[in-house]
Amino acid sequence: MSTVDILSPAGEKTGSVELPAEIFGVEKISIPLIHQVVVAQNAAARQGTHKTKRRGEVRGGGKKPYRQKGTGRARQGSTRAPQFAGGGVVHGPQPRDYSQRTPKKMKAAALRHALTDRARHNRIHVVTGVIEGENPSTKAARTLFGKISERKNLLLVVDRADEAAWLSARNLPQIHILEPGQLNTYDVLVSDDVVFTQAAFESFVSGPNKAVDTEGSEA
């Protein structure tokens, strides 16, 4: 079980906390599992409202454009056939549901594997708070994040009730804010570092993500 330092809003070490092995210490990270869950998550985010009109849905074209024989041209029955300009679209996209069925255990396991990868590369951080006091300060939040990591994309996990942290960090570019219950595999992977407030960290590790992988190793 590894440990990480707990930093104050000023960036100073105030203590340390252990990263539970069942969440941050998976023995073997499964890339196919992570890939499957991320693909499913991105697919579920698609609206699927794309729509083209078939020849039967396009307005007009009810009259035969010219007689069947004697013109020397190919026979045509409607000017709304796919080969005509203004005609219907053949095999075009239609509204559909792109979502895939992904078991909850699979989602939770993929998240643990992603967090393990970040923990192995020392990219999990815990802070007592984003700012000192209750007055929001974007400047103070920017200074803290600069001390935590030189990398740009940070995922900040804060408690729902920590309004000062939300207001301080929400306008910072490349800072994505989530609650502990919203933490997911995709957002962990697209972020360089994951920063927990201490309250959010305690809430997350005591939640439903504390489980055992089906392969037999703890995750």
From Swiss-Prot:
GO terms for biological process: translation. It holds the Pfam family Ribosomal_L4. Part of the 50S ribosomal subunit. GO terms for molecular function: rRNA binding; structural constituent of ribosome. Signal peptide: none annotated. Belongs to the universal ribosomal protein uL4 family. Residues 43-101 are annotated as: Disordered. This is Large ribosomal subunit protein uL4. Keywords: Ribonucleoprotein, Ribosomal protein, RNA-binding, rRNA-binding. The gene is rplD. One of the primary rRNA binding proteins, this protein initially binds near the 5'-end of the 23S rRNA. It is important during the early stages of 50S assembly. It makes multiple contacts with different domains of the 23S rRNA in the assembled 50S subunit and ribosome. NCBIfam families: rplD_bact. It comes from the Bacteria.
